[in-house]
Amino acid sequence: DILTLPAAGSEESDSCVISDETTHTKTGFGSPLMRPVFSIMNPELTYTLPPYQTACGSMDIMAHAMERYFSHTQNVEMTDRVTEAILTTVIHNLSVVLEKPDDYAARAEIMLCGTWAQNDMTGCGRAQDWFNHGLEHQISGFYDIAHGAGLAISFPAWMEFLCGKEECIPRLAQYAVRVWNAEMNFDNPEETAREGIKRLRGLIKEAGLPLTLSEAGVGKEKFEEIADNMTNGGSHTCGAFYAFT
């Protein structure tokens, strides 16, 4: 594997996505046999990436980390901290490379974050969510939208919805404090959680990514089909941090 776009983590991942253009469906597939035996990771190969693709890739990296981070599994302090380090490193270095595309150190940091976010070390011993990836796969099955751009739309909206679920607020507030350096409001942790979402949206906007489906040219006409594809005709729920039906 020769890495040219830090995002999917294919250099150490056991996962891939299979697309069926006739049914407009995308399905994730994973096996230990998928992991590369050898990968070449040279940050210089990413210097010429367009800013939009750089931003999309960075959002995908953050999404891989957050799919594992948002979990109700207890006593996962070490993997929490590693995931937070991945997220804060991407946040810092994305702004650097968008300003200076040939910054070797910043490109290298993002590249390594992409690897660690998807080799599943941060998912060790904990339940993982994956609602947002499942949703984005179905959206991009119908519409021409970059994966990272779709995740930039779905993740903040998903977080905002979960602010209304009491069992989810503690972790959302922890994310806001540890990743975005928000001040913890112990009297109103939901307010802290919403501050983290606000700061995530700020990064997405600064990076030039869409925040709404309409910005990305996605209408409402396929919503029912997307939901049907996600739930396999309503036969199962989606997500572990919060189960959608």
Kindly give the residue locations of the regions a language model identified.
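Alpha-helical architecture
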Residues: D1, I40, S58, F131, ...
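A glycine/threonine-rich phosphate-anchoring loop and its flanking beta-alpha core
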Residues: D1-M78, P170, Q174
